[in-house]
Amino acid sequence: MTILHTQINTRSPEFAANQAAMTALVDDLHTLLARVRQGGGAKAQERHTSRGKLLPRNRINCLLDPGSAFLEIGQLAAHEVYGEDVPAAGAVAGIGRVEGVECMILANDATVKGGSYYPLTVKKHLRAQTIARENRLPCIYLVDSGGGNLPRQDEVFPDREHFGHIFFNQANMSAMGIPQIAVVMGSCTAGGAYVPAMADESIMVRNQATIFLAGPPQTRSDVGVQIRAGFSGRLFLVSKEARNHFGRVFPAIRRREVKQQA
């Protein structure tokens, strides 16, 4: 075996200076990633958990096989892009093992702008789907999203790979035999409602999950009718028309769905 010799002097002042500079950069990166993992911040997380809901990374940890790794992608997506904090573009995405099967998992972070989709959230979601398609990874969507970010809705559609391409990908991967599984974790409005609607299997968490294109506020403003979220989009109503499973609590949700379909 050929030995490659180095001429770097690890005791030189130049090496020490470079090492110190790199260590500082790595420390800065770790600090930034730790801040990103806080999502929308302590107040938003407290409000989220007070409703009996898990944070997105905790949801993923409950789903993964015990002790298995999670390869996260796009942690710094949307960092310092919009003039406001949108940590990880409001979604956590990565590859993890569920029931022994490598899966692409994407979880909306409702603590970040209600889990709404900014332009780079769309790009991140599409990138995750591309990786899944190229490697034939089952997709698990942990949905808790208000759909397209309204102040930027003009930016999430005018593109060849726009917001609607997410659902195009779901349909095509389903046709390819790549399982598309959605777990509805909260209120899924407008664009957020299409992900479970287009999935092969949808699981809805009892007393938390709702799906509607236009929720109670819009119904009230558009037609003057006041209705409850449970009436317009709660799981008992949706389940009459779609294949949905009732999940009482998320950690107990049917992980075997992945194994059955993969």
Residue spans for each PLM region:
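N-terminal cationic and glycine-rich segments that engage phosphates or anionic surfaces
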Residues: 219
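Terminal-region recognition feature
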Residues: 1-187, 191-194, 198-214, 228, ...
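N-terminal low-complexity segments that are often proline-rich with Ser/Thr-Pro
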Residues: 222-262
